[in-house]
Structures are given as C-alpha cells and as structure tokens.
Amino acid sequence: IDYLGYISLEWVYRWSKDLDSAGIVIPQFANYMEAYRPTKKLDLQMDSRGTGYYPWPKETLIDLTFPDVLDRVCELFPNQYAFRYTELDYTRTYPEFRDDVDNLARAFLAMGCKKGDHIAIWATNVPQWYLTFWAATKIGCVLVTVNTAYKIHEIEYLLRQSDTCTLVMIDKYKDSDYIQIINEICPELKDSEPGKLNAARLPYLKNVITCESKVPGCFHWDELHEIADKVPYSEVERIRRTIDKHDVCNMQYTSGTTGFPKGVMLTHYNISRSEERRVG
C-alpha cells in the first residue's frame, strides 16, 4: 500500500469463531496484501542497540513509573515516531514528545497543581489527551479520565466526587457541547480570571484549559508554553524523583450500572502490568 499513514486492524471474535488467535488473522492479511496489492515495505525501526528487540524482555515485569518508561523508550528509539496523526498537525518522535510533556508539566505546576492533585481530561483521541496523561504522571498528579458522552449531571458528579482541580477539555463531541455544559455548571467562570475559578458547585476546580476555542475564564492550550516558563524544569525533575510505582496515577470511573459511578484508583504498576498482559 503506497500510503504514508497507518492501518488499524480489528479482530472481532464473533466474526470468525473458528479462529482462536488474532496472531492468525494479521499475518494472513499481510500475506494477502503482499500477493495481490502493490506494497512498499518500510525498514524495521531499530533500537539504539541495533537489535530491534523489545525494550524489556518478554515475560519481564515492568518495574518502573511512567516517566521512567518514557525515558527508557526515548533512549532506545530516539528516531522512532511516538505520534504521527494523519488529520491533525501533530507528529513527534519519542524525545520530542517527552519535551512537550515536560513543558506541559511545568505549566501545570505554574497553575498550582501539586503532587496528588487530580487533573481531568474530557477529550477524544487528540494529542492533548496523551500529553495531559504523561505530564500528570511526571509530577505525581492523578489523571481523571472523563467519558466523552457525559452530559451535564454526569460530568458535574465526576468533577465534584473526584475533587478535580484542573480540567482539560475540547469544545464538544457529538451532541455534547462541553463549553456550554461547563459554563452552566460554573456560571462564575465567564467572570473569573484564568486559574482563579471559585465555583459554588465545584469548589475544588480552579483551572479550566480549552484545547480549541478561547473561552472567558479559561486558559487556552496555545498559551501554556508561556505559563510553563514560570517554572524551571529542575522542579519537574525534583518532583519526579519522589514518585513511586505504587503511587496512584489514574482514576477511571465505572459505568454506574448498580449505582453512582465509582472512581477506580490505578497505580503506575497496575497500568503497566495490565498493558503488558494485553500486548504481550
């Protein structure tokens, strides 16, 4: 395929119940494309050791925090793309992505975020989602993931119950207008100075960051690099050294089938082990 982007393959068991492994499906797809379609193979991206191996031996426990994992990958694959969006203007190698993460971490600190604080992300599959997660983990904050389909009562409950201090959000998704929703929950926002929100219904929320439109009372994503200049990188590194693999780094809310949604607290170790089992 003469295509510079990427192809995603989805294997759904119900479509082929006689197959018990996606390991059968994907090689057969590659063989078909090679036999019947004009293809162009790309060279394998080698690691810095020239081995092409995994960063860790398979079946080995990843005993590191997320910042340590990112540093390891940057060292081994300095020229490999971490992100290459086809429709959004965001292409970064791993070291370039880490630089963006560090700058966002500095901006969070400049806004008053501290180790243990909760930062919520209300967005789809955009670069800001990943940057927010990795920046939060770098300074010991907890990322609160928000369902993109949430309506006003659901997001208000989550932000209040999670004690979120900073919210990063896109403008809208499908029929949910996030800006309208947050202004309805926090009518004080439009008259507030960015970073100094004092909302009666969400007393812990101080910072709202918009990724697209500029909204009164909110920081805009493009302004964050200037805010980051107020904090030296050494402060990020100082906090990073205090983070333990058993520290909570992510709060995911349940669906609330039998009651109100509950926040599930996940540590660096929980997630790295879960991902290792999923892709290993």
Task: Map each language-model feature to its residues.
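Conserved small/polar residues in nucleotide/adenosyl-binding loops
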Residues: 254, 276-280
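Flexible, non-catalytic linker and terminal segments flanking ANL/adenylate-forming cores
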Residues: 40-64
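Conserved pre-ATP/AMP-binding loop-to-beta segment of ANL
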Residues: 78-81, 201-205, 210, 216-253, ...
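Histidine-acidic metal/acid-base catalytic patches
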Residues: 1-40
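Conserved AMP-binding/adenylate-forming core of the ANL superfamily
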Residues: 62, 79-134, 151-156, 220-229, ...
